[in-house]
């Protein structure tokens, strides 16, 4: 539930390496 400061509209979350996932076109962690 914490925004990672990254969007994932066109590309995947680069911050996925930090445990972030795409939700509602924004990368979140927990």
UniProtKB/Swiss-Prot annotation:
Q: Which Pfam families does this chain map to?
A: Cyclotide
* PROSITE patterns the UniProt entry points to: CYCLOTIDE (PS51052), CYCLOTIDE_BRACELET (PS60008)
- Report keywords, A-Z: Antibiotic, Antimicrobial, Disulfide bond, Knottin, Plant defense
Cross-link Cyclopeptide (Gly-Asn): residue positions? 1-30
Q: Which domain of life is it from?
A: Eukaryota
Ranges in a coiled coil? none
Output the InterPro entries linked to this UniProt entry: Cyclotide (IPR005535), Cyclotide_bracelet_CS (IPR012323), Cyclotide_sf (IPR036146)
PTM comment text? This is a cyclic peptide.
Which cysteine pairs are covalently linked by disulfides here?
Answer: 4-20, 8-22, 13-27
Gene Ontology process terms (BP): defense response to bacterium
State the protein's purpose: Probably participates in a plant defense mechanism. Has antibiotic activity. Inhibits the cytopathic effects and replication of the human immunodeficiency virus. Active against the Gram-positive S.aureus with a minimum inhibition concentration of approximately 0.2 microM. Relatively ineffective against Gram-negative bacteria such as E.coli and P.aeruginosa.
Question: What does the domain comment read?
Answer: The presence of a 'disulfide through disulfide knot' structurally defines this protein as a knottin.
Q: Which family does it belong to?
A: Belongs to the cyclotide family. Bracelet subfamily.
Give the protein name, as stated in the record.
Circulin-A
In which organism is this protein found? Chassalia parviflora
